[in-house]
């Protein structure tokens, strides 16, 4: 009888220990998950602001974009738009700091792949940016192992996006074959970095990040992209406008207009450009830039949900 009671007591204690161990493990998982969610939320919330700011380490994200969706402006029209915006600047608390024409074109990267022991060429959809002065929306090459090199200065050089370089095994000094329009040329990779339009690395409008080898972006000099696309010097299809400081803007996920001054400025610039240019143009702030907005929404969502998610776990 004593032996039987001892065995039953041992089994009962074992079950109790197992339950205690299971509960302890669940608590530990919840604590570590909560710490991870909180760390991510707080990190990304401040990180993007630091990247976008006008500093030695930032890119100086534009405050207003003017886009020609149907073609390009020549150098005279590009300069006229900037002059018109400056001359017609409204009476506002926001002051114009800079206006910079920019060229951005859809194109192709020609990627060599080996399949079944034979080499073939794969066409990868791409977006190419011509960045000359680069006072606004600069290419970002952080001091980190991920990135290296310098900006493109000659018309035969290119900076490749870090996700493209890692996914396609491209290194500094490599030559890449790219195209835009009917042109196809080879460019030397002199830098590996990022750009604000592609921090969320996906084709425009796609909610899913691009798989390696399916999308490419690169940052050439203005003359390099003009040479590639065979268009005249000084051509642009985007005007970047920088306002002194960092004005508030209307956040799409709220009912309130947090950036009334900037919204009024966007309307004024839209009217100015419409008077200068017959073709329709798009004028918008950062809330309409896909990569910028989806990352902001991600950071906002992380801050809102990490506490209840941790509680549910």
Each model region followed by its residue ranges:
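Membrane transport/envelope proteins' first extracytoplasmic loop
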Residues: 2-313
């Amino acid at each position: 009888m004593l032996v039987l009671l001892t065995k039953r007591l041992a089994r009962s204690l074992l079950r109790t220990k197992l339950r205690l161990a299971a509960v302890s493990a669940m608590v530990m998982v919840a604590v570590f998950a909560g710490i991870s969610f909180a760390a991510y939320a707080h990190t990304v919330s401040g990180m993007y602001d630091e990247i976008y700011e006008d500093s030695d380490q930032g890119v100086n994200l534009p405050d207003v974009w003017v886009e020609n969706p149907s073609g390009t402006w020549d150098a005279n029209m590009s300069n006229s738009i900037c002059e018109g915006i400056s001359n017609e600047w409204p009476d506002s608390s926001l002051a114009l700091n800079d206006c910079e024409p920019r060229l951005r074109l859809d194109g192709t990267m020609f990627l060599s792949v080996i399949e079944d022991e034979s080499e073939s060429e794969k066409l990868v959809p791409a977006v190419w940016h011509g960045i000359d002065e680069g006072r606004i929306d600069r290419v970002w090459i952080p001091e980190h192992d991920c990135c290296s090199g310098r900006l493109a200065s000659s018309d035969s050089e290119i900076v490749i996006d870090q996700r493209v370089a890692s996914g396609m095994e491209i290194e500094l000094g490599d030559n890449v074959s790219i195209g835009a329009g009917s042109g196809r040329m080879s460019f030397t990779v002199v830098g590996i970095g990022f750009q604000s339009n592609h921090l969320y690395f996906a084709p425009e409008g796609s909610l899913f990040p691009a798989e390696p080898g399916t999308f490419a972006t690169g940052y050439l000099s203005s003359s390099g992209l003009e040479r590639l696309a065979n268009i005249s010097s000084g051509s642009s299809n985007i005007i970047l406008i920088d306002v002194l400081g960092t004005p508030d803007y209307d956040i799409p996920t709220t009912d309130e207009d947090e950036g009334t001054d900037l919204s009024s400025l966007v309307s004024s610039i839209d009217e100015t450009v419409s008077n200068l240019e017959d073709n329709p143009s798009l004028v918008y702030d950062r809330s309409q830039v896909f990569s910028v907005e989806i990352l902001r929404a991600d950071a906002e969502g992380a801050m809102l949900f990490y506490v209840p998610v941790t509680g549910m776990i």
